[in-house]
Amino acid sequence: MSEQKLRIGEIRYEVFDDYDPLTEEYLGKNLANAYFIAQIKKENVVQVGNRKINYSSDVKIGFDAFGEETKEKIKEYLLAAYSLIAEGAKDDGLVEYL
């Protein structure tokens, strides 16, 4: 009997306005930075008679475990989620500080 679980422990996403410190101008672009830490837990339960033995292992993977194309897709999804949260916050009267 074997069971695998994936738990995303932490997701961080930051969006910055593109700012040129030399000219002190905003260039109108958004720069994004994202990462997450996922934990995969694999449980192998072996039953010998009426005794169960649990062999489990934990593996942590990060953003760098994926290829470039997958990283870009993840960034797109996280940016879309961030945008929805930011819009909801504005509707509630909260302000985003840069």
UniProtKB/Swiss-Prot annotation:
Domain of life of the native organism: Bacteria
Protein name per the record: SPbeta prophage-derived uncharacterized protein YorB
